[in-house]
From Swiss-Prot:
GO terms for molecular function: asparaginyl-tRNA synthase (glutamine-hydrolyzing) activity; ATP binding; glutaminyl-tRNA synthase (glutamine-hydrolyzing) activity. Its EC number is 6.3.5.-. Transmembrane segments: none annotated. It catalyses: L-glutamyl-tRNA(Gln) + L-glutamine + ATP + H2O = L-glutaminyl-tRNA(Gln) + L-glutamate + ADP + phosphate + H(+); L-aspartyl-tRNA(Asn) + L-glutamine + ATP + H2O = L-asparaginyl-tRNA(Asn) + L-glutamate + ADP + phosphate + 2 H(+). This is Aspartyl/glutamyl-tRNA(Asn/Gln) amidotransferase subunit C. Allows the formation of correctly charged Asn-tRNA(Asn) or Gln-tRNA(Gln) through the transamidation of misacylated Asp-tRNA(Asn) or Glu-tRNA(Gln) in organisms which lack either or both of asparaginyl-tRNA or glutaminyl-tRNA synthetases. The reaction takes place in the presence of glutamine and ATP through an activated phospho-Asp-tRNA(Asn) or phospho-Glu-tRNA(Gln). It comes from the Bacteria. Belongs to the GatC family. The keyword Protein biosynthesis applies. The lineage of its organism: Bacteria, Fusobacteriati, Fusobacteriota, Fusobacteriia, Fusobacteriales. Pfam families: GatC. Heterotrimer of A, B and C subunits.
Length: 96
């Protein structure tokens, strides 16, 4: 399955990226090469391979849960460029 130029443009738009025409052609070739490699990997017979859950025999070495006081809201908001109603204001990136 080869990606068309339009599909590469759609991926770029969804990723909030913009490219020049040369770059789009380059990415189209590179993405198609990646997809060919994935197709090649899909042809490998793995029916007799047991799924690998852990690479080594280690168990989780998490530290014990310890309740700690959180930062005061004033300290958190002190370095924020903009805040409102005890929250940090960030630029909208979804839906643009």
């Amino acid at each position: 399955m080869a990606l068309t130029r339009e599909e590469v443009l759609k991926i770029a738009k969804l990723s909030k990226l913009s490219f020049e025409d040369k770059e789009i052609e380059k990415f189209q070739v590179e993405l198609n090469d990646i997809l060919k490699y994935i197709d090649m990997l899909n042809e490998v017979d793995t029916s007799k391979v047991e799924p690998l859950v852990y690479i080594n025999e280690s168990v989780n070495n998490f530290r014990e849960k310890e309740e700690k006081p959180s930062l005061e809201i004033e300290k958190v908001l002190f370095n924020a460029p903009e805040s409102a109603e005890n929250a940090i204001v960030v630029p909208k990136v979804i839906g643009e």
